[in-house]
Design a protein with these regions (language model features):
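Alpha-helical transmembrane segments and their membrane-interface anchoring/capping motifs
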Residues: 1-320
Length: 320
């Protein structure tokens, strides 16, 4: 019989272990005290990698499997705890000041925000004007370009040594603006409540998002996380065309009020955890629905996929 590739052994051990840890956390078998220490487990990555290198010879398969288990413990602990540390430090973001402003020439403008190690705030405002504010360190590094129907904001090439930067962006909320954000380390709060938005694209690497779509009209939202978390708030007046969420070693918290028809399709991926049965949804293959879904005035359809990932509906602490 042909032996399994070492890469398959490593990731198989990691994902199986992560899945077991996530399930143990969701079932309450792991105490809050242990979860509080989850973010301190990152040295397991170094230990696992070192073991794999040292014993890559005669004990290679065993070492690779052990390294995968160690990585799985870390991933499972972080996903289950919903806590993802970033490399930006704990310093408070700097005070905001004026940076740039302008206006769009019509509806359907495209906005691209691509930032590193930052606390980002995005909100909606009346009219066609956009406004960007930044703290002193961010202002010296931001690259901004704009046109009649576009706005691009990017981090420059310099490396931040003073902790998180601070950027705030106000956009027209009623013009069907298309918003794309990409965050590498840091956190973002997108307050898009009550607005009319086009397509919303969210990408995060070691990032934490809070997205408020209460009473908003959105053509589509797509969010992808790697080692991150996101909380998404819907209301009974939210209108959204499609919602696609994916995570690798990440977690989504989704808040939906009672009375909204919710359908969640869970992809057949590895080590994906959820609480949909606990929240009273009924299962039909890969699809979960709230009672009365078909007759609800407001319906929200979500497609979720991932590896070593978790989907939590209406968590006790909310989605903020």
């Amino acid at each position: 019989m042909k032996s399994a590739p070492r890469g398959a052994i490593f990731w198989g051990a990691a994902l199986v272990t992560a899945g077991v840890v996530i399930l143990a956390i969701q079932q309450g078998y792991v105490s809050d005290e242990i979860l509080a220490e989850a973010t301190r487990w990152w040295p397991l990555i170094l230990i696992g990698a070192g073991v794999a290198v040292i014993f890559a010879g005669s004990l290679g398969v065993v070492a690779i499997g052990l390294a995968g288990v160690l990585l799985g413990l870390l991933i499972g602990g972080l996903v289950g705890a919903g806590s993802f540390p970033t490399a930006c430090g704990d310093d408070e973001p700097g005070q905001l000041g004026s940076f740039a402003d302008g206006s769009f020439g019509g509806s359907g403008a495209d906005v691209q925000i691509d930032l590193n190690c930052v606390s980002l705030e995005v909100g909606g405002s009346a009219g066609s004007q956009w406004v960007v504010e930044a703290d002193e360190e961010s202002a010296s590094d931001l690259e901004l370009s704009s046109g009649d129907q576009r706005l691009e904001i990017r981090s420059g090439d310099s490396v931040s040594l003073g902790g998180r930067r601070h950027v705030a962006v106000a956009l027209p909320r009623d013009g069907g603006t298309n918003l794309s954000t990409s965050l590498n380390a840091g956190d973002a709060t997108l307050v898009l409540a009550g607005g009319h938005w086009g397509a919303i694209q969210v990408d995060g690497n070691a990032a934490a998002y809070v997205i408020d779509l209460s009473d908003a009209e959105v053509d589509a939202i797509e969010a992808s996380l790697n080692a991150g978390s996101a909380g998404i708030q819907f209301s009974d007046q939210t209108s959204v065309g499609s919602v696609r969420l994916s995570a690798n070693a990440g977690e989504f918290h989704v808040c939906v009020p009672e009375g909204v028809g919710l359908q969640v399709t869970i992809g057949s991926d590895v080590a994906v955890g959820h609480n949909l049965d606990d929240e009273g949804l009924t299962e039909d293959g890969d699809v979960w629905r709230t009672p009365g879904y078909t007759s609800a005035d407001t319906r929200i359809d979500i497609v979720f996929s991932g590896n070593a990932a978790a989907f939590t509906l209406n968590p006790e602490g909310g989605c903020s």
